[in-house]
Every structure is written in C-alpha cells, then in structure tokens.
C-alpha cells in the first residue's frame, strides 16, 4: 500500500533532497533547499518511508510535480507516481501537471514518460547555462484516461 502524508518537516524534506543518491540524479547537482511555496508529501510504501513527492502550483490549477525517492523504494517508482496522480486528482482541482528532467538525466526522462507525462519540449542551457532540460506535461483528462485504462 502506498500512502502520502502532507508534511512541512523541513529537516526531513532537506535530508531526503540532499541524500547522496538524490543529488547524484538531480538536475543541477547542488542539493535541495526547502521551498515554502511547495506542498510536500511523505511517501510510504508498505509501511516503509521512501521519500518525498511535492508540487508547486505555478499557475492556477497547474502543478509542477517532482519526486525524491530513496534507493530502497525505487522499484516502486511507477506505482508511486500513478498513486500520486490518483491522490492529487481526488484531492485537488488540478487541471495540468508539469515536470522536467535534465537531458543528461535519462532515468528522469524515462520516469516522466512512464507515469504518463508527454514530452513538450527542450530548453537549451537551462541549468547553469550548460545542461539542457526537457519539459513534460499532462492534463487532468489525460491522467484520468491513463489511470482508468492504462494508456
């Protein structure tokens, strides 16, 4: 069973965001600082704490979503991502979700596609004037279709 518990525990959020395995796969490698404008959730998989998912409402009803999974639960990442879509579709009025991954971070790009996000474009030199970033998005209707029909 996968659960999401809202949290504002800054120490926990930054501990996960600055875990060496998270930083190694991050877009800029600088680590993570708590952002008060974001909504954070503790992820538990079968009773085991596994990381943090969060979103920032960047426009009304548009959520920029990200995940920071500890290595112990990464085998459940697809299930967690889909469960998080169910959670926010049920508990919010979100109409569009976005995310992004550095072009050099193939695992992040594959993850976005695996959980139903569509590639919408690339911005060159987005990170520190060096690394390109690929953006992904899906509408509420697209996520609902994915969750209901698996496509």
Curated annotation (Swiss-Prot):
Source superkingdom: Viruses
InterPro entries associated with the record: DUF2824 (IPR022568)
Keywords: Late protein
Entry-linked Pfam families: DUF2824 (PF11039)
This protein's name: Protein gp14
Organism placement in taxonomy: Viruses, Duplodnaviria, Heunggongvirae, Uroviricota, Caudoviricetes
Gene it is expressed from: 14
């Amino acid at each position: 069973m996968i659960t999401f518990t809202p949290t504002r525990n800054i120490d926990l959020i930054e501990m996960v965001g600055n875990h060496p395995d998270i930083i190694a796969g991050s877009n800029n490698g600088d680590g993570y600082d708590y952002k008060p404008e974001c909504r954070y959730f503790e992820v538990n998989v079968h009773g085991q704490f596994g990381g943090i998912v969060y979103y920032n409402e960047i426009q009304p009803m548009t959520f920029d979503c990200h995940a920071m999974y500890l290595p112990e639960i990464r085998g459940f990442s697809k299930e967690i991502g889909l469960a998080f879509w169910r959670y926010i579709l049920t508990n919010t009025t979100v109409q569009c979700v976005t995310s992004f991954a550095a072009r050099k971070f193939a695992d992040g790009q594959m993850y976005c596609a695996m959980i139903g996000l569509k590639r919408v474009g690339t911005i060159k030199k987005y990170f520190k004037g060096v690394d390109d970033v690929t953006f992904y998005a899906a509408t509420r209707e697209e996520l609902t279709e994915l969750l209901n029909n698996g496509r």
